[in-house]
Amino acid sequence: EIRLSLVGSEMCIRDSYTMVKWAVGMRLKSPGIQAVEKALHQGEILRTHVMRPTWHLVAAEDIRWMLKLSAQRIKSANDSYAKGHGLEITEQQYDRSHTVLGNILSGKRSLTKQEIAEHFERSGLLADNYHMTRFMSRAEVEGIVCSGECHGRQHTYALLDERVPPTPELTKEEALARLATAYFRSHAPATLQDFSWWSGLPLTEARQAISLIEPELMSEQWNSQTWYIHDSCRTSGKATGNLHLLPSYDEYLIGYKDRTDVLPKEDYSKAFTNNGLFFPVLLYKGHVVGNWNKASKKKEIFPEHSLFRKDICLKEELLNQAKEKYVRFLTH
């Protein structure tokens, strides 16, 4: 069974969809791609734009209150970008696109972006890549569409209200508290700045969210910053598994504004680029030490790796165990 109590972020790049599934699967007791694909296909996990906004995986029961927290901020950012580039879309055009989406997706249909574009063109709407991206992004943050059933490797859209059963509406304070709890339960120790970066919340709202769950948090001063630890987090005990293959855009890196505790700044470029592309990395005893990728040979699935930390020597047995876990995930 898969239960998401948080969201994960990812970007839409070539081969990223397998990495997205691995990000969930590697955290399961029995990793298997079929279980993750089933959850995505059935709508237990949704892949949509929310928070910062980039692509995220969201538990279905969390989607509405998360959209309520971030929708206006995302719309303002998108509108500001469009205005600055002379590419504004009118509210009438957005309304028209929403009407068409309601008609063509009604009846629990799932359609790809290209299929939707063909319907838009027939309805007199502009359907080039720019307009489609804006139309679909607005429909997502308005809570009209979300990810649909899996069509092979192609992302699809479906009507949110047909895909996700009704859920109790939360107040803004309840939503802020729930988001803060989810973050610090899974990312602690972390700072206010980390939480603000991850959530997309302004510092004032991020600070309010932390104050709402203050009884659940411990705070420690270290390196001139306040670090928060959720009371559900283990602070002692033996960690299992010294080496992990982290997918691109994994929460271990992207979930924090400051990553220097696990990755020296001089190695940043080996893990991610200045324009926000994150690579698959090797995690050894809590530190990022190298890269890995799928095998270069077509029929080979055993991953390849390279180290950029020259002071680290990894045992072959340890590497093989980590790689075999990934291979088992792909084949189960």
Identify the meaning behind each predicted range.
Residues L40-T99:
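A contiguous, low-structure linker/loop signature
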Residues K265, A271-H332:
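Glycine-rich, small/acidic residue-mixed loop/short-helix segments
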Residues R14-S16, I104-T112, H187-A190:
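Short capping segments at the starts of secondary-structure elements
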Residues G43-V50, V141-C150, E214-E220, W292-N293:
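A short, conserved structural fragment
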Residues L212, E216-D267:
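Non-catalytic regulatory appendages
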